From Swiss-Prot:
Species, as recorded: Acidovorax sp. (strain JS42)
Domain free text: Consists of two distinct domains, a catalytic core and a N-terminal extension that is involved in tRNA binding.
Function: Catalyzes the attachment of serine to tRNA(Ser). Is also able to aminoacylate tRNA(Sec) with serine, to form the misacylated tRNA L-seryl-tRNA(Sec), which will be further converted into selenocysteinyl-tRNA(Sec).
Record's catalysed reaction(s): tRNA(Ser) + L-serine + ATP = L-seryl-tRNA(Ser) + AMP + diphosphate + H(+); tRNA(Sec) + L-serine + ATP = L-seryl-tRNA(Sec) + AMP + diphosphate + H(+)
Protein known as: Serine--tRNA ligase
HAMAP family: Ser_tRNA_synth_type1
SUPFAM superfamilies, per database record: Class II aaRS and biotin synthetases, tRNA-binding arm
Gene from which this protein is expressed: serS
Family: Belongs to the class-II aminoacyl-tRNA synthetase family. Type-1 seryl-tRNA synthetase subfamily.
CC per GO annotation: cytoplasm
Pfam families linked to this entry: Seryl_tRNA_N (PF02403), tRNA-synt_2b (PF00587)
Length: 442
């Protein structure tokens, strides 16, 4: 959530930055905001005036009673009662205004950092760097590559079974390919915990609405979530605050560890990681990536979260991006790093890097990780603070990133390590997790 003081101080600048995002008119109704702010100021000024009058009258009442001027004292008491009634009404309206402002701000995305490229869609994203084991360009396989579907189905990917069990955009894995998927997740966790200093966490796969509000998925993106229904058809409706949702990413539970907490500065940075399934409705994705595992309702991901001092968050962003890159480099997978433009960033991000892995069958790069600095945007919603050197409570900065999406990494391994006979060479770093197995073959 944006700092309302920033909007009050320089609304025009904030609006100008918001207008660089996609569909800015959907974020903030400037006229409605200004009207509420004007009414708030009027009420507060009137409240101060009435409080001053009440204090003066209260003093007069004591003096009048002391002089025996009972009628005048009673008249002053009547004025005080009238002022109290008006103050009570003003307080009620002020609470309503504050609530309306909070609801309005909950729908407003984060302000882009000044270093973010300006643009309306992914065509304006800027390539930062690229990497390949053979130099900057991916090597040619020397034959026409198969995609992961044609490669994977003989090896144990079963899309038909996924449809049978759950519907479209679900996948079943069996045998060696299921083991390879598990090996990737274990390898990623080991890299992040043993080499990069993250604490491994096991978290619930369902969370409450407060958790999703804290990280920004609610209220604006409820349509992207899977709600967990309680009871049967005759069960009573679930109150909003008791509704549970399947996690869209373990960023949600991990970041909510610090909700309503005040940390010691010495505890920063907190570096957390978890391997979980993620559940997304993929609303608005009809017709996109319908073949294979690229866009699924359920997929596994190893998530990285850092809770940091505000002065350190952009250093942490670069560090976390390198942590995600390290996994790709150890796997020998060609990739590029993209700085997302203002129109392509997520709701809570101030700056985002996407890592895109090379898929030979598509002859293109596809997203495999997103690493974002949310600055204080989530922390303000979460009331996540630390006690600074001056002894004052200050909002932390939060960052999150994929380290990596396991299913998409499996896709990349299948396609980049395929052989002309349809077998797949297992990357050397994964072989200890595969009992020494060097290839997947029918």
């Amino acid at each position: 959530m944006l700092d309302i003081l920033l909007l009050r101080k320089d609304l025009a600048s904030a609006v100008a930055r918001l207008e660089t995002r996609k569909k800015p008119q959907a974020f903030l109704n400037v006229e409605a905001f200004q009207a509420l702010e004007s009414e708030r100021k009027t009420i507060q000024m009137r409240t101060e005036e009435l409080q001053s009058q009440r204090n003066q009258l209260s003093k007069q009442i004591g003096m009048l009673m002391g002089k025996g001027e009972k009628d005048a004292a009673e008249a002053a008491k009547a004025q005080v009662a009238a002022i109290k009634a008006e103050l009570d009404g003003s307080a009620t309206r002020l609470d309503q205004i504050q609530g309306e402002l909070q609801t309005m701000l909950a729908a407003v995305p984060n302000l882009p950092h000044e270093s973010v490229p300006v643009g309306s869609d992914e065509s304006a994203n800027v390539e930062v760097r690229r990497w390949s084991p053979d130099g900057q360009q991916p090597r040619s396989l020397g034959f026409t590559p198969k995609d992961h579907v044609d490669l994977g189905e003989p090896l144990g990917l079963d899309f038909d079974m996924g449809v049978k069990l759950s519907g479209s955009r679900f996948t079943v894995m069996k045998g060696g390919i299921a083991r390879l998927h598990r090996a990737l997740a274990q390898f990623m966790l080991d890299v992040q915990t043993q080499e990069h200093g993250y604490t491994e966490c096991y978290v619930p796969y369902v969370v409450n609405a407060d958790s999703l509000k804290g990280t920004g998925q609610l209220p604006k993106f409820e349509g992207d979530l899977f709600a967990a229904q309680k009871g049967g058809q005759d069960a009573e409706p679930v109150p909003d605050n008791a509704q549970l949702y399947l996690i869209p990413t373990s960023e949600v539970p991990l970041t909510n560890f610090v909700r309503d907490e005040v940390l010691a500065e010495a505890q920063l940075p907190l570096k957390l990681t978890a391997h979980t399934p993620c559940f997304r409705s993929e609303a608005g994705s009809y017709g996109r990536d319908t073949r294979g595992m690229i866009r699924q309702h359920q997929f596994d991901k190893v998530e990285m979260v850092q809770i940091v001092h505000p002065d350190k968050s952009y250093e942490a962003l670069e560090e976390m991006t390198r942590h995600a890159e390290a996994v790709l480099q150890k796997l020998g997978l060609p990739y590029r790093v993209m700085s997302l433009c203002t129109g392509d960033m997520g709701f809570g991000a101030a700056k985002t890097y996407d890592l895109e892995v090379w898929l030979p069958a598509q002859n293109t790069y596809r997203e495999i990780s997103s690493v974002s600095n949310c600055e204080a945007f989530q922390a303000r919603r979460l009331q996540a603070r630390f006690k600074n050197a001056q002894g004052k409570n200050e909002l932390v900065h939060t960052l999150n990133g994929s380290g990596l999406a396991v299913g998409r990494t499996l896709v990349a391994v299948l396609e980049n390590y395929q052989n002309e006979d349809g077998s797949v060479t297992i990357p050397e770093v994964l072989r200890p997790y595969m009992g020494g197995q060097a290839t997947l073959s029918v």
